[in-house]
Amino acid sequence: MKKICSSIFRVLVIPYVMCGFVAAQNSYTLNGLSELKEFTAGSVEETVENLTLIEPEGSEMIPESEILKLTDRVKKITGTLTMEGLSQLTTTTGLIDVIDCSEAGFVFRDCPVLSNMYAFADEDKFSVIHGDFIIENCPRVMTGAATAHLDKSFSKIREVQGDLKLTDITTAMNKPQKI
């Protein structure tokens, strides 16, 4: 019996460990400030697949300072980061440049004061977006098409491997137009 167990261990367990098995990653949808606070109160920093933060209409506003606390809890995002309806979010800086989002896709939807997309200017991390790049109804977001804004925003992105959708944003700093 001992010989059989030893053989099973060599055939099944050792290759399992040697192949660098990676456990499934968690995905999270956080609806509102209380769920965000509960999530960020956790002490384990982890890699997540998808992370969605939603400020439901009519709910308590989520302060940007609370959103940025995600960096203490999330080490890396390998799927999609979705930020939806966040009435206080003004910047990507301090969030996607701190969390490793180099393999992630992004959805920013209905964020009325989001304007600073400067974290995407990091060409090493974000020249290729490994998923969707969707910005919808974020009227203060600028494309970086203006000369003064050329090295900022998301003008360094060269490829989007998923869906690309830009609606209701400002096209250039010197000529505000909606696209």
Residue map of PLM features:
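N-terminal capping/linker segments that flank leucine-rich repeat
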Residues: 2-4, 8, 22-73
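Concave beta-strand-loop units of leucine-rich repeat
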Residues: 30-33, 50-62, 77-88, 96-113, ...
